[in-house]
């Protein structure tokens, strides 16, 4: 057998239980306190999947994020709506066969105001992952170039000329 080095870049498919719970959270059917154990269980399953496969560096599967792009805008003030079709092409609507749900692209990816950190970008994700993983923990962060590409003269110039 040939040994091949692998790393998980970031996102794994979110389990249907997590998707359903996130929908109930957004609609107000459950509280954040009721949602958290479901989210934690999804992270635990993602870590176990990677470790059972022998992957040496593991992520939380980005179970706590709407998308790989949402970590920074969730932690930093100053982002707002911007048309992103020119930069993020393709459909975000998965096939029912893989349990995916239709979803809109993440909001608030464009810079509207000077950026100010509200909380650490990935401290919660990393702290939880490090406590659960026996493998090397890793949290994926979005490249700054994504947000540079989403600079818009219409909405960003006042903050960053």
What are these regions (language model features)?
Residues 1-161:
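Domain-level signal for soluble alpha/beta catalytic cores
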């Amino acid at each position: 057998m040939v040994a091949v080095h692998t790393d998980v870049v970031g996102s794994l498919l979110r389990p249907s239980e997590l998707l359903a719970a996130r929908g109930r959270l957004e609609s107000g059917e459950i509280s954040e306190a009721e949602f958290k154990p479901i989210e934690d269980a999804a992270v635990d399953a993602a870590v176990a999947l990677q470790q059972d496969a022998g992957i040496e560096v593991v992520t939380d599967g980005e179970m706590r994020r709407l998308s790989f792009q949402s970590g920074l805008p969730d932690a930093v003030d100053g982002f707002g709506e911007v048309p992103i079709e020119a930069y993020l092409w393709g459909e975000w609507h998965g096939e029912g066969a893989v349990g995916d749900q239709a979803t809109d692209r993440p909001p608030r990816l464009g810079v509207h105001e000077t950026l100010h950190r509200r909380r650490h970008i990935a401290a919660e994700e990393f702290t939880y992952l490090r406590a659960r993983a026996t493998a090397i923990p890793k949290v994926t962060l979005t490249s700054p170039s994504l947000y540079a590409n989403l600079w818009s003269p219409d909405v960003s110039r006042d903050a960053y000329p």
